Amino acid sequence: MDGLRLRFRRAYPGFELDIDLALPGRGVTALFGHSGSGKSTCLRCIAGLEKAAEGEVTINGETWQDSRRNLFVAPHRRALGYVFQDANLFRHLTVRRNLAFGLKRIAAAERRVELEQACALLGIEHLLERMPERLSGGEQQRVGIARALLTSPRLLLMDEPLASLDLKRKGEILPYLERLHEELDIPVLYVSHSPDEVARLADHLVLLENGKVRASGPIGETLARVDLPLALDDDAGVVIEGTVSDHDPAYGLLTLVLPGSALQMRVAHAPLAPGKRLRFKVQARDVSLNLRDDAQSSILNRLPVRVLELVDTDTAAHVLVRLDAGGNPLLARITRYSRDQLQLRPGQLLWAQIKSVAVLA
């Protein structure tokens, strides 16, 4: 059976973890929440490093823990890869020998990832004979990820793998994580404090608060939920994955078709082949509303939308409007004055003017 079934209950001094999740068996699921919400503890339970009094861990049909059957597979027998904030490479071994450490744990007939494939995916072929002290922080982390992949895991756990890197190094490593997502059919549980990382990498989002699941769902739907604290953040917005239809070389604009509709958006981007999927984020503060389409506007992206819901924010001046754009969620943060002037109400049809689009690549 495909899918991840995760259920834990364990009490700690001043904290209780109580998790009950059914997650997709492929793609990247992000565990997101404030410090102390239980993200890393959840990963440790999955790995068998924290034996919960009550628990179940089933990964695409393979059960590693089921307290009802008194079943507990030892951590070293669980087919998972674990990537931490620090690569934890063996300082006395070359990169090649560090990678061999992960590879030798798996019989040749059972290997799903080979050395050459892992090196190519992470772009580390030229580093194989170096010692760890001669690697940058980003290079060390890429080697650590490759070593985890070479254990041929059925599940990859990543506990804030970019937290110790500066912005430049993060920017260097994110494309490699996207390649893993695209080219390997290994489910990933990804812990992060960074909304930008989550928006760029995740397919599914789990929001944790005080050891419990506050929300779980596809990234686009969950970010658009106005009942969650994420919607009140200054950088609140939605993530959409469009399909490239064409490129205008005269203006350097890509045309993207929105999922499940004929609606299109244009973004400044280098040429991409038709059919290529491109993920982007639209922030609520960058969306304004109009009762009619203004074709004379400098704003390129104007979409017909329907009002779904209006909610108060934590400021006296603004409201948040949840919109439907051809089946795609959209958020707009506007003033209360504008709400009253436009006489907005659920079900109303109007136009969303998107002033800025952030391509997540």
Swiss-Prot record:
The protein's name in its UniProt record: Molybdenum import ATP-binding protein ModC
Membrane topology per record: Peripheral membrane protein
Catalytic activity: molybdate(out) + ATP + H2O = molybdate(in) + ADP + phosphate + H(+)
Localization annotation: Cell inner membrane
Positions of ATP binding: 33-40
Record's function text: Part of the ABC transporter complex ModABC involved in molybdenum import. Responsible for energy coupling to the transport system.
InterPro entries linked to this entry: AAA+_ATPase, ABC_transporter-like_ATP-bd, ABC_transporter-like_CS, Mo/tungstate-bd_C_term_dom, ModC_ABC_ATP-bd, Molybdenum_import_ModC, Mop_domain, P-loop_NTPase
Coiled coil: none
Sequence ranges assigned to domain Mop in this UniProt record: 296-361
Key words, A-Z: ATP-binding, Cell inner membrane, Cell membrane, Membrane, Molybdenum, Nucleotide-binding, Translocase, Transport
UniProt xrefs under NCBIfam families: modC_ABC
SUPFAM superfamilies: MOP-like (SSF50331), P-loop containing nucleoside triphosphate hydrolases (SSF52540)
